[in-house]
Amino acid sequence: GLKIATGEYIGFVDSDDDIETDMYEKMYNAALKYKVDFVMCDYQRINSNRTNFNKTLDIDSGFYDKEKIRSDIFPALIMGSNIDYGPLLSVCLCLYKRQFLTDNSITFANDVKWSEDNLFSAIVGYKCNSFYYLKTEYLYHYYSNPGTITTSYRAGAWNVYCKMNEYLHNFFDQISDYDFSEQLKIHMIYYACNCLGMASKLSEEDALH
């Protein structure tokens, strides 16, 4: 999709989610007003029993320049010290300037088919010069359904996560202006725990296969 896109901005919506009708209008207007590389919003989590939860990030609202990105975002760009994702994880909450992505050759790795946001967003966060956060604008609707690819066991997941970490090392090991080495270690700890947690939910018969 990124290769054939011709629009000025690019957004992503998962097939089992939906958005507010004015989501991209609000984000587009913010992108034009503040002249940023991307705009990010908040989301509403909708569970299978139809209960809704508004989810926001523990970072400031508004405009982020390179200095503020370095001070507020870089410390958890890949993975936080609490062994959890950083604030820029989900591409579905963002509207990206296409020229920014193409100028920096930012795309998705074909062999990272799960949690691909983590790799993509980490590189975006490092490369961008500015972004704008529409805090408390719950414009994206994320449906948390049992059995989706984000909640079910996936055979071969560990190999995919190792490949993702390899790509992250290839990029961030070359960087000299900030030390991401601890985050790269925590990244592997997180995904090791993720795979062990998923495997522990399998029946004995499934685990043998």
Language-model-detected regions and their locations in the chain:
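C-terminal subregions of glycosyltransferases and related glycan-biosynthesis enzymes
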Residues: 133-209
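Donor-binding/catalytic cores of nucleotide-activated saccharide
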Residues: 18-158
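Catalytic metal- and UDP-sugar-binding loop of GT-A-like glycosyltransferases, i.e.
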Residues: 13-15
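Short, conserved alpha-helix that lines the donor NDP-sugar binding/gating region
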Residues: 1-6
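Short aromatic/hydrophobic "clamp" motif used to bind/position activated sugar donors
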Residues: 10
